[in-house]
Curated annotation (Swiss-Prot):
It catalyses: uroporphyrinogen III + 2 S-adenosyl-L-methionine = precorrin-2 + 2 S-adenosyl-L-homocysteine + H(+); precorrin-2 + NAD(+) = sirohydrochlorin + NADH + 2 H(+); siroheme + 2 H(+) = sirohydrochlorin + Fe(2+). Residues 1-204 are annotated as: Precorrin-2 dehydrogenase /sirohydrochlorin ferrochelatase. Then it catalyzes the NAD-dependent ring dehydrogenation of precorrin-2 to yield sirohydrochlorin. Finally, it catalyzes the ferrochelation of sirohydrochlorin to yield siroheme. S-adenosyl-L-methionine binds at residues 225, 301-303, 306, 331-332, 382, 411. The active site is at 248 (proton acceptor), 270 (proton donor). It holds the Pfam family Sirohm_synth_M. The gene is cysG1. GO terms for biological process: cobalamin biosynthetic process; methylation; siroheme biosynthetic process. SUPFAM superfamilies: NAD(P)-binding Rossmann-fold domains (SSF51735), Siroheme synthase middle domains-like (SSF75615), Tetrapyrrole methylase (SSF53790). This is Siroheme synthase 1. Pathway: Cofactor biosynthesis; adenosylcobalamin biosynthesis; precorrin-2 from uroporphyrinogen III: step 1/1; Cofactor biosynthesis; adenosylcobalamin biosynthesis; sirohydrochlorin from precorrin-2: step 1/1; Porphyrin-containing compound metabolism; siroheme biosynthesis; precorrin-2 from uroporphyrinogen III: step 1/1; Porphyrin-containing compound metabolism; siroheme biosynthesis; siroheme from sirohydrochlorin: step 1/1. Keywords: Cobalamin biosynthesis, Lyase, Methyltransferase, Multifunctional enzyme, NAD, Oxidoreductase, Phosphoprotein, Porphyrin biosynthesis, S-adenosyl-L-methionine, Transferase.
């Protein structure tokens, strides 16, 4: 360990900053955020320093650095572009046993300033010891994305409750269980994120009055269309906190690799014509796991409320009083169209978009006349087996046979493949792809050649329609 990690209490402590430029300005912000009494020494000062001085937030001393400026200082930072000045600051501070940081000079530094994630009072520091500051910054950015903004409020709330918890729960195991419930309470977290402190206080009171026996919950999470990079931050947080993850065939391996390692995984994959697990049994799995006190994530491809039967599953849970919440995902229509270079709406082509299931209930009848109207884009989910019917009905109800269509197979993944042609060829084209595939119908498909960015970048095989038709024939 090259450096001993330590957090300093600088509230009302005198600190010296040598330098008046842009880098010094960044260091000054950090010192001011920490509540330090900051004195800045430089020959020239950036405008922000004068603003701070006018506001009484810090003091300015104009002129060359002299060692006497270190009197009564707790620490000093040298942030000038003159090596000789920085060296003098370090040497003088060292002689007086004052911690000194010289920016970008590890050899003349007695302490380093790491990359920080500030969720006060939670503070996280990342340092490479000056060896790879860019790597430290990249790690900080990843952590910044993972940690919710309300984390500091949650920590502050926990601190305010410590004494009350000690008095209310005399047994240590009960205290631990209470803290676990409070710190993983989704609705409390959401209230804090919304700055709704009244609602947050209500959730806290419910936790104090509720029995400490484990009570599970279900979080319905949309995994997106395939590319793990399209999983939302909140979705990622949920799958990394889950005790159990119930997932289906449309959830990519890349997304599943992000699930908490010790979480139980239950596969309930479904596909057209073959249900590995009946929907009623899936409902029972969710119910039983939640009733046993587990934190359950129901992970669905795309968005769970768009042809994902998420509403049906939650209705079942609601009937038994099981707490639940929903994390939306990027639906296949949005992901597949974007990764195929096909805008769903365009001022010159389509003023509306319709999402249509290819597997409605048998008694359901689509309004084909409206679907065949001009100036709109149609996106059919689970429509491969019905491609012939879709082609026939749309043409029969007035849509031109030359209308452009595209079929997107394994959209947004590295295995994505797109075939395109005319509506009159849809049935034949459907034989060139396999499930999961999405059907897009509308003149916006004609923009694909111009806007296709993903397949050209990944060198995907993109067979032409003429090749598909010739192959089928």
């Amino acid at each position: 360990m090259d450096y001993f990690p330590i957090f300093c209490q600088l509230q009302h402590k005198a600190c010296l900053l040598v330098g008046g430029g842009e880098i010094a300005e960044r260091k000054a912000r950090l010192l001011l955020d920490a509540g330090a009494l900051v004195t800045v020494n430089a020959c020239e000062f950036a405008p922000q320093f004068h603003h701070w001085a006018d506001q009484g937030q810090l003091s300015l001393i104009s002129g060359e650095f002299v060692p006497e400026l270190l009197a009564d200082k707790w620490l000093v930072i040298a942030a000038t572009d003159q090596l000789s000045v920085n060296a003098l600051v370090y040497q003088s501070a060292n002689q007086q046993r004052i911690f000194c940081n010289v920016v970008d000079d590890p050899k003349r530094t007695s302490f380093i300033m790491p990359s920080i994630i500030d969720r006060s009072p939670i503070m996280i520091a990342v340092s490479s010891g000056g060896k790879a500051p860019v790597l430290a910054r990249l790690l900080r950015e990843k952590l910044e994305a993972l940690l919710p903004q309300h984390l500091g409020q949650l920590a502050q709330l926990a601190g305010n409750l410590r004494q009350r918890v000690k008095q209310h729960f005399t047994v240590m195991t009960e205290r631990r269980r209470f803290w676990e419930k409070l710190l993983t309470h989704d609705r409390l977290a959401q209230s804090l994120a919304n700055n709704d402190h009244v609602q947050a206080d209500q959730h806290v009171e419910q936790l104090f009055s509720a029995p400490l026996t484990d009570r599970g919950e279900v979080v319905l999470v949309g995994a997106g269309p395939g590319d793990a990079g399209l999983l939302t931050l909140k979705g990622l947080q949920q799958i990394q906190q889950a005790d159990v993850v119930v997932y289906d065939r449309l959830v990519s391996d890349e997304v599943m690799n992000l699930v908490r390692r010790d979480a139980e995984r239950i596969f309930v994959g479904k596909q057209s014509g073959h249900h590995c697990v009946p929907q009623e049994q899936i409902n029972q799995i969710l119910l039983q796991q939640a009733q046993s006190g587990k934190r359950v994530v129901r992970l669905k491809g795309g968005d769970p409320f768009i042809f994902g039967r998420g509403g049906e599953e939650l209705e079942e849970l609601a009937g038994y009083g099981i707490p639940f919440s929903v994390v939306p995902g990027i639906t296949a229509a949005s992901g597949c169209s974007a990764y195929s270079g096909i805008p769903l709406t365009h001022r010159d082509h389509a003023q509306s978009v319709r999402l249509v299931t290819g597997h409605a209930k048998k008694e359901g009848q689509l309004d084909w006349a409206n679907l065949a109207a001009e100036k709109q884009t149609l996106v059919f989910y689970m429509g491969l087996s019905q491609a012939g019917e879709i082609q026939q009905q749309l043409i029969q109800h007035g849509m031109p046979a030359t209308t452009q269509v595209a079929l997107v197979e394994n959209g947004t993944s590295r295995h994505q493949r797109v075939v395109s042609g005319e509506l009159s060829q849809l049935a034949l084209l459907s034989q060139q792809v396999s499930s999961p595939s999405l059907i897009i119908v509308g003149s916006v498909v004609s923009l694909r050649e111009k806007l296709n960015w993903f397949s050209s970048r990944h060198h995907d095989d993109q067979p032409k329609v003429t090749e598909c038709v010739a192959h089928v024939g």
